[in-house]
Amino acid sequence: VDARAILVAAGDHGVTAQGVSAYPAEVTAQMVANFVAGGAAINVLSRAAGARVVVLDVGVARPIPEGTPDPVRGGRLVTARVRAGTADMTLEPAMTRNEALAAIDAGRRLVAEMRAEPAGLDLLGVGEMGIGNTTAASALSAVFTGAPVDAVTGRGTGIDETRRRRKVAVIEAALALHDPDPADPIGVLADVGGLEIAALVGAIVEAAVARIPVVLDGFISTAAALVACALQPAIAVRTIAAHRSTEPGHRLVLEHLGLSPVVDLDLRLGEASGAAVAIGIVAAAVAIRDGMATFDSAGVAGPA
């Protein structure tokens, strides 16, 4: 697993107009600029994990602030913007079916390109950036697991209980409006998903089909895996859950997919930070498997 990479997909969410997040939507574009400049947590953690970072703008609503890209510490920015953020899912589908497919294809094509690069690709971590995306992830989780919306909806960026209840009501309204059918994963994704989530679906499918292990970051990345596994159930065996976040829906989705997290540290940052931590542990496990002597080969006596 020498060729390690982390893909961070970015996109905005129209549902933020309903007051479901503690942060303004412009934070998405600002954080993408930070990823490229090398100042974010994922930049630091990816270097520690020996992984290169690629940032995919598939649906950021605002222009990325100009800054100074750092070719050493920063991530490489790839722009494949399908649209400037999703629509408000409480009023209309988050995106059209064709837009969902285009975002999936953007993630798929990027992973294919990463595989073809001289550096290659042996292990892929996936994460995201998008204010409002825990709302979309909770909606997807409710549809595919059948769990009540309240059970899969947490505090996201740190909202209080009053706003969390508002978030639950917003998701319930969106699901009542669209009545998404879990037998139609693309339709569900288009109705209540996100552009960056769709891109991660494509990335997960492309890597898994190529037999490349995929390390899922947190709740949103795992929600993307839900969609990917609904499309191709065999994909689950190629995924590794990096951690279990504080979001209640994350635990339920991991159980639904039959995944056990590598670590359980109450992480809630996003941006693939947990995936970077887990990649280091996965690499250590592979090194042990490949390089550590057995008692027999080392001439060590067994139990008396």
Range-by-range predicted roles:
Residues 1-304:
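N-terminal loops that bind phosphate or other acidic moieties
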